[in-house]
A protein has these predicted regions:
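Conserved N-terminal phosphate-binding loop of PLP-dependent enzymes in the Aspartate aminotransferase
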Residues: 1-430
Length: 430
């Protein structure tokens, strides 16, 4: 069967034929390729087409797909049993690795998804402070829990529905919205609601409305404001964690939050996430505190094995982040060179191995700037990139993920694809 036929069948069985909306390729007007396997820097569809992968399962595959050490660890763990619903030494070992890499994680809990990690962190912050209000930023995405589906990014932004039906107004009445990279908007909220705000949650690098870096002083400003008002500062590092640096964005920018959520890389590609932070806050979590959180599959031994293998690889290979920076800078240069060569009205944003191209003539520093990008031009760029053998996110509002498995030949092919895509997207859509 080919992707079109599988997709038709999938649409009879699953909403939109997919298990996560952006995978349906609606934003680019195409049928999604159905994937058969992946290895290293490549992903293969059911027709046998090989693509250079810049999605990387939406971030986890920082070292490439099916890394031998990770596969070996998963296999060994699965042979012993796929789930116990009981504590294991593997959980302790992984927690120690996380704490070594990210010292602010004094205590932590393992869960199954980024959504669950964020949902739990917010509940704990509310329990710790005795307050109800949460501050989030427009365009930032923190999973699909009800209270955070307000002016959200990622798939909601892709589908042009930043709020979700099915969420009672009462669930979002305690969610306050600030503007990313705008400290004044944050200060105004705290001046009005400061004694009611339990936590402020932020993607330290916004990566779910495309990649938008924090401006100088923004993250430190958030740290100062939350400290002044006694609110918990939560960094959502589901994407940035272990990607920008071994210690995540908090290490990269030198700003320490009270709590952090991790996902994607921390599970080595398996369903795994972690939340945690200061000991006095995490002491509120059951069974030693009054905030309840539980999960049958939390700390799943197979996922724990994958995450442990992944973090060990990142810790042992001290040059991996230098290589990622070199490869990412080279791809960024290819984008910027083609933009200049073909006089394309576009902006390229990059932080480490995360980047985005926006088809707009204004610098992209905020959600409002993001919304000026021409989506038809992005769709044309996407179609040419796919035809050139590049597997990239089918949405303007998702990141371009660089991985360490990319070879010199892959980079050269990518440079040629970018040149072709920006040439054609400019000529046909400008």
């Amino acid at each position: 069967m080919n992707s079109q036929k599988i997709f038709e069948k999938a649409c009879e069985l699953m909403p939109g034929g997919v298990n996560s909306p952006v995978r349906a390729y609606r934003a680019v007007g195409m049928t999604p390729p159905f994937i058969f396997r992946a290895k290293g820097a490549y992903i293969y569809d059911v027709e046998g087409h090989q693509y250079v992968d810049y999605v990387g399962s939406w971030g986890p595959m920082i070292l490439g797909h099916a890394k031998d050490e990770v596969v070996k660890a998963v296999t060994a763990a699965a042979i012993k049993g796929t789930s116990f619903g009981a504590p294991t030494n593997g959980e302790v070992e992984l927690a120690e690795l996380i704490q070594t890499a990210v010292p602010s994680m004094e205590m932590m809990r393992m869960v199954n998804s980024g959504t669950e990690a964020v949902m739990s962190a917010i509940r704990v912050a509310r329990g710790y402070t005795g307050r109800d209000y949460i501050v989030k930023f427009e365009g930032c995405y923190h999973g699909h829990s009800d209270g955070l589906l307000v002016k959200a990014g990622s798939g909601l932004l892709t589908e042009n529905v930043p709020d979700s039906a099915g969420v009672p107004k009462a669930f979002t009445d305690t969610t306050l919205i600030a503007r990313y990279n705008d400290l004044d908007s944050v200060r105004k909220l705290f001046e009005q609601y400061g004694d009611k705000i339990a936590a402020l949650i932020v993607e330290p690098v916004a990566a779910n409305m495309g990649v938008v870096p924090p401006e100088d002083g923004f993250l430190q400003g958030l740290r100062d404001i939350t400290k002044q008002y006694g609110a918990v500062l939560i960094f959502d590092e589901v994407i940035t964690g272990f990607r920008l640096a071994l210690g995540g964005a908090q290490s990269y920018y030198g700003v320490t939050p009270d709590m952090t959520t991790f996902g994607k890389i921390v599970g080595g590609g398996m369903p795994m996430a972690v939340y945690g932070g200061r000991r006095e806050i995490m002491d509120c979590v059951s069974p030693i505190g009054p905030v309840y959180q539980a999960g049958t599959l939390s700390g799943n031994p197979v996922a724990v094995a994958a995450g442990t293998a992944m973090l060990k690889l990142l810790m042992e290979d001290t040059a991996v982040y230098e290589r990622l920076e070199e490869k990412s800078a080279r791809i960024e240069h290819a984008f910027k060179s083609a933009v200049e060569k073909y006089h394309v009205k576009a902006q390229v944003n990059r932080v480490g191995s995360l980047m985005s191209i926006f088809f707009t003539d204004r610098p992209v520093k905020s959600f409002d700037d993001v919304r000026t990008s021409k989506l038809a031009q992005f769709a044309q760029y996407f179609r040419v990139m796919k035809a050139q053998g590049m597997y990239i996110a089918p949405s303007q509002y998702e990141a371009f993920f660089v991985n360490d498995a990319l070879s010199e030949a892959d980079l050269q092919k990518t440079e040629k694809a970018i040149d072709a895509a920006l040439s054609q997207s400019f000529n046909e859509c400008s």
